[in-house]
Amino acid sequence: MVDIKPEQTQEGNNNDHLVQSDDPEHPANLIPELCRKFYSLGWVTGTGGGTSIRRGEHIFIAPSGVQKELIKPNEIFVLSYPTPKYPPSARKYIRKPSALNPSACTPLFLAAFDRGAGCCIHTHSQWAVMVTLLVEREKGKSGCFEISNIEQIKGIPRGKGKGMLGFFDTLKIPIIENTAFEEDLTESLEKAMEEYPDTYAVLVRRHGIYVWGDTPAKAKTQCESLDYLFQLAVQMHAHSLPWVVNESA
């Protein structure tokens, strides 16, 4: 048996052992499974979107520009963490599949991991896009998405170590403007994280959303809860129903 040296990259054996496991919860197996589920929900259509998981000192990332529902474990990129966001050439890839491109979402995923996340999901959900447009029309570009008095809000954390939001709480999700290139979103994403320190998601106008969680399971369920709320909000707006209930009215 050939000894595998972790420090080797694509010039050597490419550290294939990092993505080889029979454990369904291993990031190299879980990312393709999650992407298949997200594709079925219309979140990663046409190669859009992405998913990344941090496990210890390794970050596992789906490749860019591929059909997300067809991703295989051996197509997963692996980064050593911590690693620089910029320039891309400084990032510490310890596994790079041949003929595939690293995710353009990488620096945004890293921003979530720098906040302690264990998983970050990026989707192109139509409902997420729609609420960014409705907020812009109603509140202007500086407005954030807000909704209250909906049971599903309980699926969203109140903040790190603060438990979950309650039925009567108002969920607030910041919105940033889209850019021509994905990586150029990083600065405004990090600014939104600073302005909304308790948020676990950032919407991108006319683009989609980034959602992160302490674990892959939490990131997934939070993403599902948010998409439910976005869809409901669009339908509520169509019926002239307010998103935030004014209890004093």
From Swiss-Prot:
GO terms for cellular component: cytoplasm. Its cofactor is Zn(2+). Zn(2+) binds at residues 122, 124, 207. Binds 1 zinc ion per subunit. The active site is at 151 (proton donor/acceptor). Residues 1-25 are annotated as: Disordered. Its EC number is 4.2.1.109. SUPFAM superfamilies: AraD/HMP-PK domain-like (SSF53639). Pathway: Amino-acid biosynthesis; L-methionine biosynthesis via salvage pathway; L-methionine from S-methyl-5-thio-alpha-D-ribose 1-phosphate: step 2/6. Residues 9-18 have a biased composition (Polar residues). It comes from the Eukaryota. HAMAP family: Salvage_MtnB_euk (MF_03116). Catalyzes the dehydration of methylthioribulose-1-phosphate (MTRu-1-P) into 2,3-diketo-5-methylthiopentyl-1-phosphate (DK-MTP-1-P). Belongs to the aldolase class II family. MtnB subfamily. This is Methylthioribulose-1-phosphate dehydratase. It comes from Arthroderma otae (strain ATCC MYA-4605 / CBS 113480). The gene is MDE1.
